[in-house]
Amino acid sequence: MKSQMYQKIEASTCHVASRKMVSNFAMKNENHLDEMIRLAFDIKHDLHVKAFWSLDLVCEKKLKQFAIYIEDFCIILPRIKDDSALRPATKIAFFLTKSNHRKNGISLTQEQEHNLIEALLDRLIQDEKVASKVYAMKALFVLGKKYN
């Protein structure tokens, strides 16, 4: 039997209202959020793109709930191939770097920062859609302030 979270992601569309509904549902329960993140990070799963669509909205509102998954995110980011999942993934990377730059934000380890830098630079070099490149450039700009 499919879980409620799975069914909501499966029924979601690319429309903002649909993605907001799924992200709000995930933020209400840590188990739902965990399931959404597991689906998003499983790049071979059919719903991984849809899960990323809503995950970027979760990270925009409540990034600290995503903090325990940063290590896995740094591993999965370079492996994402689908353009539809890449835009929200690079947007999440931007949120992480922006938060890392703040005093009371999420602290990234130096290794995590370097993994993000490497993955984001690869995205700029590769033939990707513009939206993911924009978020990659924004994130690299924020990280560049630290590494001059």
Predicted features, each with a name:
Residues M1-N148:
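Alpha-helical scaffold domains
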